[in-house]
Amino acid sequence: MPRVCDTAYVSESAVIIGNVEIKGDVYIAPNTTMRADEPGSEIIIESGCNIQDNVVIHALGGSAVVVGKNTSLAHGCIVHGPCALGDKCFIGFGSVVFNCTLGDDCVILHRTLVKDVIIPARRLIGDGAVVNKQCIADRLSEVTVEDSDFVCRVVSTNLVLAKSYSKLRSR
């Protein structure tokens, strides 16, 4: 059964199935799907995350998806386990992340494929990139101050949304 902290906001149209843990101050937008329904699978969403509209998170049997603190999964992205995302990461619109480990503060922009690699902390992956070999992952550039500021703004905006929607629901 899913476990959801009482300070998290989960849209009524979100589908959360199986061994899923959602920690505090998390925003789960409409039409999100999280499935940890295969044997031995789990999904952990750490505090302060925002999971935007139409995101799909799925953990294969015997695997986990862990989304680090204050991480943003933007509209329509797919995160498929096994996968571990560090703290303060951003996964852009329509991106696919599968069988990966991302260090803290990584920014993956829109329509990107990241598969079967380990991404060091503070790396930037541009729009439409395909990172499916470790030699490509090892050559990624570092995020800029502007990239980090953008991620902080996204997290802050969605935390306000989560709190506002929670207040409306409790009326």
List each model region and its residues.
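Glycine-rich hexapeptide-repeat left-handed beta-helix
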Residues: M1-R3, D37, E42-I44, D53, ...
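Extended, small-residue-rich solenoid/repeat segments and analogous flexible loops
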Residues: M1-T33, P39, G48
